[in-house]
Amino acid sequence: MDPSEMWGTGDYKAVADRIASAGETLVERAQIEPGMDVLDVACGTGNASVPAAKLAARVTGLDFAPALLTIAREYGADSMVEVDWIEGDAQALPFEEASFDRVISCFGHMFAPDHERTADEMRRVCRPDGRIAIACWTPEGKIGEMFRRIGAISPPPPEGFQPPTLWGTEDHVRELLGDDVQFERHHVEWRGDSVEGYAEFMEDSFGPLIAAREQLGDLLHETYLEYLNDVNEADDGALRFRGEYLVSVA
């Protein structure tokens, strides 16, 4: 399945709504001000674009998945903000050098295969006195653990593959964006009425899990259930756990 189509399967907006607080946190840490030109790279359904636009910034939201941009447009309209939604590749941004005061990405840039190229593009379009602010799940956190477990049962990745959660390590970000980077760790709380119900919801809604289920069948479901039971902090039959992410501001 083509990656841009994969993200359009299921109901990603329902998943994105659960991590909306991370977009708000990222926008706050980016110190966006009215009138600034802001680019949200791999904007998804607009979790960071819309909060930035609410601050009276001039926001461009870019993503390679048309289905996600359709949802983002609806979200922006419902929120009564103006965002320029553009289909495009994080590894080949369709903008001139030094076009933006802020370049942000909330869990989107991390999925671009070539980390160096993605970082170079973000730096290229950011103004010399601007800032790049990104959020990524940490590899040692509970979402990072999900990526590890599913990766362990999946076919070997192509040569040179870089795990998305490398963006959640300080050393890797410094290698990509330079030494002048500030880091903060935050958490998103994930909740469900039950482990089984949450697993069903995610496997039906989250594009990467849908694709993995098609490829791995019951092994994916069994592995995901085991993971959820291991990370669950609730003792009342429900599901509750905290996913750690790293905010990097350069």
Put a short name on every predicted segment.
Residues 1-36, 47, 51, 71, ...:
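Conserved class I S-adenosyl-L-methionine
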Residues 18-19, 45-47, 166-176, 180-250:
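Conserved Class I S-adenosyl-L-methionine
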Residues 31-33, 54, 113, 127, ...:
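Short conserved AdoMet
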Residues 37-41, 45-92, 117:
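Class I SAM-dependent methyltransferase SAM/SAH-binding core
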Residues 91-102:
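A short acidic, Gly/Pro-enriched loop at the edge of an enzyme's catalytic core
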Residues 102-115:
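A short SAM/SAH-binding and catalytic strip from SAM-dependent methyltransferases
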Residues 116-117, 123, 127-193, 209-213:
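Conserved catalytic/acceptor-binding region of the Class I
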